Amino acid sequence: MFQQLSARLQEAIGRLRGRGRITEEDLKATLREIRRALMDADVNLEVARDFVERVREEALGKQVLESLTPAEVILATVYEALKEALGGEARLPVLKDRNLWFLVGLQGSGKTTTAAKLALYYKGKGRRPLLVAADTQRPAAREQLRLLGEKVGVPVLEVMDGESPESIRRRVEEKARLEARDLILVDTAGRLQIDEPLMGELARLKEVLGPDEVLLVLDAMTGQEALSVARAFDEKVGVTGLVLTKLDGDARGGAALSARHVTGKPIYFAGVSEKPEGLEPFYPERLAGRILGMGDVASLAEKVRAAGLEAEAPKSAKELSLEDFLKQMQNLKRLGPFSEILGLLPGVPQGLKVDEKAIKRLEAIVLSMTPEERKDPRILNGSRRKRIAKGSGTSVQEVNRFIKAFEEMKALMKSLEKKKGRGLMGMFRR
């Protein structure tokens, strides 16, 4: 997500790079480009107008017209405005000894999947979640949550057709007490569109169960429609926080930039993949940095630590072998798709595609070598390279290009040797 917006904002700011002082007309032109980029990304009109006005006022306050580095001033100002539009500081629901949360939203928003993802997330934090399939009209919705609960290893309480809120409350309380469950996640009824029966059912269930949080799940790919949904749910039911799903999609991102402003509610979580673990706390400052090409090294460092890679000592360029290269490649695969990882690095465009098949071919080349060949590529004569190409399903030319690239990489590493980190993993060692 945000590839188009990211490219447009970086292009608008980039036009000021390398220039000395700029004129007021230059600033106006840059702000016009920023406004167009926001509107094309389906950002709410009021949000876009307020955003540009804030950037203009703060840039002038920082005397951008007198600055010798106007691009840096505008970049910093846009970053702060983006961060605030997305919610400012990161926030999560406050946990108590016992917690009961509602998940509300339309069908297709990812609400039921999000319930299971939340259960898995908090299970990993030491909580004992219980999922409640509370759609009294659609047995298929209850079955979906039951299957997801089995997948993430969390029990599911299914309501019965037409069951009253009072009965649901009694059964939920009893099961939570008997099994010592301290986080109850209620997947409420979903509909294809907002209607009075749906809202009435939700309001009645809320009145009886008394949830601590009401989390509205919004599909970030639905654009301005998501904002209408958010307003309706907040007015009729009362929303305490938002979860944005499908942030890994190709949508323009307007909902993410507008939802907090329109509802006044914090964005707690973001769905970043379809996998059960594909739910992350929402960090406004990190997303703002990614959009502006500033990277998100904090998220990358977390992935490295979660994969247990930070304790592995990096080797010097002189010691680095193809065996080490293979190990690093396999380590990076544990962090996630290469395109996703590269997108977290400063200066790498959002949406950059990496040929994963080509990566697998490189891995196959190294795996087709003997331990001696991986240790010392200098012994790779013509016949050895031919054997490796055959064993890896590649060509001799591909093997030759790979060996040459590896040697060039070692030469580059030698020139960086005096810097603190060695290689990607070295960036995150404490």
From Swiss-Prot:
<dbReference type="InterPro" id="IPR036891">
    <property type="entry name" value="Signal_recog_part_SRP54_M_sf"/>
</dbReference>
<dbReference type="Pfam" id="PF02881">
    <property type="entry name" value="SRP54_N"/>
</dbReference>
<dbReference type="InterPro" id="IPR036225">
    <property type="entry name" value="SRP/SRP_N"/>
</dbReference>
<dbReference type="GO" id="GO:0003924">
    <property type="term" value="F:GTPase activity"/>
</dbReference>
<dbReference type="GO" id="GO:0008312">
    <property type="term" value="F:7S RNA binding"/>
</dbReference>
<dbReference type="Pfam" id="PF02978">
    <property type="entry name" value="SRP_SPB"/>
</dbReference>
<keyword id="KW-0342">GTP-binding</keyword>
<keyword id="KW-0733">Signal recognition particle</keyword>
<feature type="binding site">
    <location>
        <begin position="245"/>
        <end position="248"/>
    </location>
    <ligand>
        <name>GTP</name>
    </ligand>
</feature>
<comment type="function">
    <text>Involved in targeting and insertion of nascent membrane proteins into the cytoplasmic membrane. Binds to the hydrophobic signal sequence of the ribosome-nascent chain (RNC) as it emerges from the ribosomes. The SRP-RNC complex is then targeted to the cytoplasmic membrane where it interacts with the SRP receptor FtsY.</text>
</comment>
<dbReference type="GO" id="GO:0005525">
    <property type="term" value="F:GTP binding"/>
</dbReference>
<dbReference type="Pfam" id="PF00448">
    <property type="entry name" value="SRP54"/>
</dbReference>
<dbReference type="GO" id="GO:0006614">
    <property type="term" value="P:SRP-dependent cotranslational protein targeting to membrane"/>
</dbReference>
<dbReference type="GO" id="GO:0048500">
    <property type="term" value="C:signal recognition particle"/>
</dbReference>
<comment type="similarity">
    <text>Belongs to the GTP-binding SRP family. SRP54 subfamily.</text>
</comment>
<dbReference type="InterPro" id="IPR042101">
    <property type="entry name" value="SRP54_N_sf"/>
</dbReference>
<dbReference type="InterPro" id="IPR013822">
    <property type="entry name" value="Signal_recog_particl_SRP54_hlx"/>
</dbReference>
<feature type="binding site">
    <location>
        <begin position="105"/>
        <end position="112"/>
    </location>
    <ligand>
        <name>GTP</name>
    </ligand>
</feature>
<dbReference type="InterPro" id="IPR022941">
    <property type="entry name" value="SRP54"/>
</dbReference>
<protein>
    <recommendedName>
        <fullName>Signal recognition particle protein</fullName>
        <ecNumber>3.6.5.4</ecNumber>
    </recommendedName>
</protein>
<keyword id="KW-0687">Ribonucleoprotein</keyword>
<feature type="binding site">
    <location>
        <begin position="187"/>
        <end position="191"/>
    </location>
    <ligand>
        <name>GTP</name>
    </ligand>
</feature>
<dbReference type="InterPro" id="IPR027417">
    <property type="entry name" value="P-loop_NTPase"/>
</dbReference>
<dbReference type="InterPro" id="IPR004780">
    <property type="entry name" value="SRP"/>
</dbReference>
<dbReference type="InterPro" id="IPR000897">
    <property type="entry name" value="SRP54_GTPase_dom"/>
</dbReference>
<keyword id="KW-0694">RNA-binding</keyword>
<comment type="subunit">
    <text>Part of the signal recognition particle protein translocation system, which is composed of SRP and FtsY.</text>
</comment>
<dbReference type="InterPro" id="IPR004125">
    <property type="entry name" value="Signal_recog_particle_SRP54_M"/>
</dbReference>
<keyword id="KW-0547">Nucleotide-binding</keyword>
<keyword id="KW-0378">Hydrolase</keyword>
<dbReference type="GO" id="GO:0016887">
    <property type="term" value="F:ATP hydrolysis activity"/>
</dbReference>
<keyword id="KW-0963">Cytoplasm</keyword>
<dbReference type="InterPro" id="IPR003593">
    <property type="entry name" value="AAA+_ATPase"/>
</dbReference>
